[in-house]
Amino acid sequence: MKISPEILNLVPYKPGKPISETQREYGLTTVYKLASNENPLGPSPKAMAAVKQALDHQHLYPDPSHYELLQTLSKEWGFPTKQLAIGNGSDELIDLLCRIYCEHHDGVLTSAAAFNAYEVSAPANRAVIHKVPMAEGYRFDLPAIADYFLKHPEKNIRLIFVSNPNNPTGTYATKAEVEAFLQKVGNRDDVMIIFDEAYNEFVRAKDYASAQGYMGQYKNLIVLRTFSKIYGLAGFRLGAMIAPPEVVEVFNRVRKPFNVNDLAQVAANAALQDKEFIERSQQICWKGLDYFYKKLEELGLPYIPSQGNFVMFDTLRDAAKVNEALLRRGIIMRPLLNYGFKTHLRLSVGRDHENEAAMVALAEVLKEITPL
């Protein structure tokens, strides 16, 4: 049976190495995973309390309308429910947007070294991914992305993805850059602009602004959020979308009726209201980043100041060898060869003792492996 060439050539997304796999592979008992940008505090306590109360109802199907969660989202984010949609993680939102808007050989535009999910979802939906080189400092080059779109109508670009802040680089587009970009490509009928703001809550930069503030001005603007990071609910798989009502209506037609399970809805609803946990998550992130910066500087390793809960740094060595040596010491970081970075690793913020163990192990490994 013939398989589509787009599917055959698709390079699957490779997530961070699991703790259990590392323990089995290297014969370890203690392993610290600092590879997947998870919340080191775990899930929101209020979310877990709500989940425990909901366990007795799991013989029933989940609410297909996501009513309670949408009501809370509307209250917290200030948008009517007709502009909000829920997905099985941001991955489902990205995938279905590609399915909705792209026909065979249509284009999806983003940056080099952008979140890898765009590069997976586009060909999976028979579209073609186009990537513009990053600007200096590993930043999204929004002027170049806008110019590429405007100068290449033959590419039939239907979606533009901007991850802000970006994973894995941790860099961001400023408010002024976002505004200039939207003035060039906003309010068009031939393309949707999607800002993926999974790390929005961790941003410390004063000149950053969420694209949600421009929702009323641009009819082709979509904003994505996740519950996997600041809310600590990665295992529940839940993402949210802010979009024009007509986009939400079509999305809800295409998604599976029970795309988000009941426990995920209950957990997210409670987590949104756990302000103390959100603040604690921010503080542990910022403290951890500052610690990493200090230690990386002591080790003489270049790094990129991050607006996420992770930092990308240059080992100045073959990162695959560094990563292997770290794994043997029970430290899981994230190699970035699939993003084109041969000497870089991405390091997620953990608890204090995990961060310290990671830096001790890294210092040992650097002495063993010769710089390039």
From Swiss-Prot:
Reaction(s) the record says it catalyses? L-histidinol phosphate + 2-oxoglutarate = 3-(imidazol-4-yl)-2-oxopropyl phosphate + L-glutamate
Q: Name one Pfam family in it.
A: Aminotran_1_2
The molecular function terms of the Gene Ontology recorded here are: histidinol-phosphate transaminase activity; pyridoxal phosphate binding
Please list the residues that carry the modification N6-(pyridoxal phosphate)lysine: 229
Pathway(s) this gene product operates in, as recorded in its UniProt entry: Amino-acid biosynthesis; L-histidine biosynthesis; L-histidine from 5-phospho-alpha-D-ribose 1-diphosphate: step 7/9
Highest taxon in the source lineage: Bacteria
* Record's keyword terms, sorted: Amino-acid biosynthesis, Aminotransferase, Histidine biosynthesis, Pyridoxal phosphate, Transferase
Q: Name one GO biological process term.
A: L-histidine biosynthetic process
Give the EC number(s) under which this enzyme is classified: 2.6.1.9
Q: Which co-factors does it depend on?
A: pyridoxal 5'-phosphate
- Give the first-level EC class, as a single word: transferase
Query: What family name appears in the similarity comment?
Result: Belongs to the class-II pyridoxal-phosphate-dependent aminotransferase family. Histidinol-phosphate aminotransferase subfamily.
Q: Which NCBIfam families match?
A: hisC
State whether it acts alone or in a complex, and with which partners, per the record: Homodimer.
- The protein in question is named Histidinol-phosphate aminotransferase
> What organism, scientifically named, is this protein from?
Bdellovibrio bacteriovorus (strain ATCC 15356 / DSM 50701 / NCIMB 9529 / HD100)
